[in-house]
UniProtKB/Swiss-Prot annotation:
Gene3D superfamilies: Vaccinia Virus protein VP39. Pfam families: MTS. This is Ribosomal RNA large subunit methyltransferase G. It comes from the Bacteria. It comes from Salmonella typhimurium (strain LT2 / SGSC1412 / ATCC 700720). Keywords: Cytoplasm, Methyltransferase, rRNA processing, S-adenosyl-L-methionine, Transferase. Its EC number is 2.1.1.174. Its main location: cytoplasm. InterPro entries: DNA_methylase_N6_adenine_CS (IPR002052), rRNA_m2G-MeTrfase_RlmG (IPR017237), RsmC/RlmG (IPR046977), SAM-dependent_MTases_sf (IPR029063), Small_mtfrase_dom (IPR007848). GO terms for molecular function: 23S rRNA (guanine(1835)-N(2))-methyltransferase activity; nucleic acid binding; rRNA (guanine-N2-)-methyltransferase activity. Belongs to the methyltransferase superfamily. RlmG family. It catalyses: guanosine(1835) in 23S rRNA + S-adenosyl-L-methionine = N(2)-methylguanosine(1835) in 23S rRNA + S-adenosyl-L-homocysteine + H(+). The lineage of its organism: Bacteria, Pseudomonadati, Pseudomonadota, Gammaproteobacteria, Enterobacterales.
Length: 378
């Protein structure tokens, strides 16, 4: 938990999921402060759009202006809602939209936290292009090291004249004025053929490894079990290639695709519809924080390629939460399979949570682990 006085109001903010680390990561950064310093409340006219507000620092500060919080992270929405409540601000003060929704017309102010993925930034700038005017104040912010020439060129290409500020507390801002430059259309998804399958994989802008199959998933697919039945989960599904493979290998099983990214879940849905339409009725698609709210003892197996970062920050908090949720939602003798970088040492984490862990396969970079939910000892 951390405190920030941003000039609009004094806030106490925490990350989501919350951690008990001795040196916890902050729920806000200098770029949030720097963005807010640029605004005079008297100049805010028209809708306020906030993009990629990781834990709600901007939304909480500007809540009295009824901002729209736009992004591709359900975790960020949950974190923002929690911080609104914690600071005594009505959740209804902020309207949440995912990045593929229609943005409000003629915004007065647009604040953008520059996302990690340049493709997501381009998708969002193209969406803004449809609604902003020459009078819209457009300001983006990030750590100085995360603003590159390609970032500035993208703003110029999609929206118009762009300048950058001096660094302040290692943060930098981008100021942009909309001038309606000529711009060719771009497809909503990027597609590629998955070798040895005949499948075409479709990827929205914010999907991990959207330009091709990542090597961890490739290794995982080589070792997926067959002859499973009941309900199984592709947890943190991304574009759904693991779930697709499970559907093909296990015709008696139903697959639940889960991710905190609406773009990921929509990509998974599109990939099942396109490649295995006959299996669509065996699928469920869920935008969720891991398996929050899912009843215990529901699933026969969970498959997971857990992230070890949250936006720009390295952390295993999300993976740790995924493992705990998987154990709660597995039936007795249900199995959790994960693929991970070897250096993360998830073997001991799984053994601590499940009481057991086995190595299924390993190579010079990745390891596939299995843990089994055991019954209570008598």
């Amino acid at each position: 938990m951390s405190h920030v006085d941003d000039g609009f109001r004094s806030l106490t903010l925490k990350r989501f999921p919350q951690t008990d680390d001795v040196n916890p990561l902050l729920a806000w950064e200098a770029a949030d402060e720097y963005l807010l310093q640029q605004l005079d409340e008297t100049e805010i006219r028209g809708p306020v759009l906030i993009l990629n507000d990781t834990f709600g620092a901007l939304s909480c500060a500007l809540a009295e202006h009824s901002p729209y919080s736009i992004g591709d992270s359900y975790l960020s929405e949950l974190g923002t809602r929690e911080n609104l409540r914690h600071n005594g601000i009505a959740e209804s003060s902020v309207t949440f939209l995912d990045s593929t929704a229609d943005y409000p017309q003629a915004p007065g102010v647009v604040l953008i936290k520059v996302p990690k993925t340049l493709a997501l930034l381009e998708q969002q700038l193209r969406a803004l292009r449809k609604v902003v005017t020459a009078q819209t104040r457009i300001i983006a912010g990030a750590k100085a090291r995360d603003i590159h020439t390609s970032t500035l060129e993208l703003f110029e290409k999609v929206l118009g004249p762009t300048t950058t500020t001096l660094a302040w507390k290692k943060a930098r801002l981008i100021n942009c004025t909309f001038s309606h430059p000529q711009l060719a259309d771009a497809p909503q998804t990027l597609s590629w053929k998955l070798e040895d399958t005949g499948w075409t994989i479709h990827n929205h802008a914010n999907v991990f490894s959207r330009t091709g199959l990542d090597i961890g998933a490739r290794f995982f697919m080589q070792h997926l079990p067959e002859n499973l039945d009941g309900e199984i989960v592709d947890l943190g599904c991304g574009n759904g290639v693991i779930g697709l493979s499970l559907l093909a290998k296990n015709p008696q099983a139903n697959v639940v695709f889960v991710d905190e990214s609406p773009m990921a879940v929509d990509s998974s849905r599109l990939n099942v519809e396109t490649n295995l339409p006959e299996a669509f009725e065996r699928c469920e698609f869920m935008i969720n924080n891991a398996l929050s709210g899912v009843e215990p003892f529901r699933f026969n197996a969970v498959f997971c390629n857990p992230p070890f970062h949250q936006k720009h920050a390295l952390t295993d908090n999300i993976a740790w939460e995924m493992f705990h949720h998987a154990r709660r939602c597995l039936k007795i003798n249900g199995e959790l399979y994960i693929v991970a970088n070897r250096h993360l040492d998830y073997f001991h984490k799984l053994k601590k949570i499940f009481g057991n862990c086995a190595t299924i396969a390993t190579n010079n970079k990745f390891v596939i682990l299995k843990a089994v939910k055991q019954g209570r000892r008598r």
